[in-house]
Regions:
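Asp-based, Mg2+/Mn2+-dependent phosphohydrolase catalytic module
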Residues: 2-14, 19-38, 49-73, 80-260
Length: 260
């Protein structure tokens, strides 16, 4: 099956695909030049809800890649999109999170509040406290919908793993006895948002990621074509063992693009 015949656009994960531990994976300026030369539209889609979009743009610029803000989506934006569908006019929400989440919600008309909130929205918050846990628990038990940015329980740093958004969601879930609606991968929210931006059908869009349980599972659920790269957390053995197999397994993003 010649993927190159049908693919019109790309949804690219960032961590483990474009960089690892802040170091670029491959010659990024050349890779993105090739993506644009081949005429692919693309969106960078990440579960990271902590950084703001300008911070992502700045980081990519440091690595020699110029990206427009409308070429990036993250799970904070997917959470705001989910809320907007339910509460079109915006309003007060209880937020457990950092600037990336607060800013994404503000764009859609939602602002942080402590009382009479429409929903509880939670993600990674490196200043998480018992008091925040208690407030989130209170609002959810009073009937506020509980939305989580992404389920990643940990994320890698050079010397190991640290707690991610999923660990905070797990604490709130344990206290409130309520599971969150997840906005990020592998739930469809983030891909849905990316497809809206791209304007292409799932079958002609290739999702490229390094994590089977989020990037590949999520992409397959949405009917996207999928490419698993071995430049992040997945080993060749894990890739071979996973079924249903992705459309492509490649060493890195450069190889994916060369095969399209």
């Amino acid at each position: 099956r010649l993927l190159s015949m049908i693919i019109k656009s790309l949804i690219l994960d960032m961590d483990g695909v474009i960089w690892k531990d802040n170091s670029p994976i491959g010659d990024l300026p050349a890779i993105f030049q090739e993506i644009r030369r081949k005429g692919f539209k693309f969106i960078l889609a990440t579960n990271n809800a902590v950084r703001t979009l300008p911070a992502f743009q700045e980081k990519l610029a440091e690595l020699g890649v110029e990206i427009h803000l409308n070429e990036i989506v993250n799970s904070a934006m997917a959470a705001a999109d989910l809320l907007k569908e339910r509460f079109p006019s915006g309003g007060p929400v209880y937020i457990v999170g950092e600037d990336g989440l607060i800013n994404a919600l503000a764009v859609e008309g939602f602002y942080p509040a402590d009382d009479h909130v429409l929903a509880v929205v939670a993600g990674l918050d490196r200043k998480f406290t018992y008091e925040k846990l208690n407030r989130a628990n209170y609002h959810i038990r009073c009937g506020a919908p509980f939305i989580g940015t992404n389920p990643d329980r940990t994320f890698p740093i050079p010397n190991g793993y640290v707690p991610g958004a999923g660990s905070i969601l797990a604490a709130i879930e344990a206290a409130s006895e309520t599971s969150p609606t997840i906005a990020g991968k592998p739930s469809p929210g983030l891909y849905h948002l990316a497809l809206k931006r791209l304007g292409t059908a799932p079958g002609e869009t290739l999702a490229v990621g390094d994590r089977i349980e989020t990037d590949i599972v999520g992409g397959q659920k949405m009917g996207l074509r999928t490419a698993l790269v071995l430049s992040g957390v997945t080993t060749p053995e894990m890739a071979e063992a996973y079924s249903p197999a992705p459309d492509m397994i490649a060493n890195d993003l450069a190889e994916v693009i060369s095969r399209l």
